[in-house]
Curated annotation (Swiss-Prot):
Organism for this UniProt entry: Trypanosoma brucei brucei (strain 927/4 GUTat10.1)
Example of a GO biological process term: 'de novo' UMP biosynthetic process
Enzyme class: oxidoreductase
The protein, known as: Dihydroorotate dehydrogenase (fumarate)
Highest taxon in the source lineage: Eukaryota
Subunit (UniProt): Homodimer.
Function: Catalyzes the conversion of dihydroorotate to orotate with fumarate as the electron acceptor. Molecular oxygen can replace fumarate in vitro.
Matching Pfam families: DHO_dh
EC number: 1.3.98.1
Record's keyword terms, sorted: Cytoplasm, Flavoprotein, FMN, Oxidoreductase, Pyrimidine biosynthesis
Active-site residue numbers: 131 (nucleophile)
Amino acid sequence: MSLKVNILGHEFSNPFMNAAGVLCTTEEDLRRMTESESGSLIGKSCTLAPRTGNPEPRYFGLPLGSINSMGLPNLGVDFYLSYAAQTHDYSRKPLFLSMSGLSVEESVEMVKKLAPITKEKGTILELNLSCPNVPGKPQVGYDFDTTRTYLQKVSEAYGLPFGVKMPPYFDIAHFDMAAAVLNDFPLVKFITCVNSIGNGLVIDPANETVVIKPKQGFGGLGGKYVLPTALANVNAFFRRCPDKLVFGCGGVYSGEEAFLHILAGASMVQVGTALHDEGPIIFARLNKELQEIMTNKGYKTLDEFRGRVKTMD
């Protein structure tokens, strides 16, 4: 039996990686991810200049997940480029970098810096079009004209295969519209579904107060709250974008949720809230649990069931 994934010119020992935003800000974070039993890792969504992010408290654990409004805290693109060029041990596992420019011009400037490193090292770009927690900055992925502009400019500036991280969609028409845009850009090779469900509100009934400070308490939901929405988005884009890969993200706490993401069409599976809660040791457990499910079902490889979810039509 094998959990290996061969995509994007790389071999991954298994489909698991962190979600951009969790255990990936500092060099120590990235080292811990590299030494874990994940198949890959991704850096923190970065901006041109370092950001401290939103005021604290900005993350709050919940019974079924989390709410956060981090505001893209990161060490700035040059730190992550330096890590990719000089520090990361590519013999251990491939590396993704996440970039989240605050404008299309900023995104273009960052990907131009990354391009020579990608050519030399094989670093993979995930372009974040879906951060819901920067005050005054709407999510690019909910404006299809702006999404098209970003993809056009980044494709021209970068000139290499890359992926996009998308917000969750909730309307069939929006699946169709987003897929139509993505399918126009052959350099977009993978679609990560989904970022957190934006602008939830959690209130503590004891003190009648919101639980995070930014944006009057509004923040992105993660964890088990997200799983059905994430699976729907993974499957919707898997069906609509047959020439692209889909990465699943949302609600993965065990091998079973990972199995469901792959069944819906995911090639890689990103872990966020559960990784935040459990630490990088989680990947050993996820691998073991996914293997047990495959053994019980008689599957030898991930390809045997990827995207094979049965419908009742």
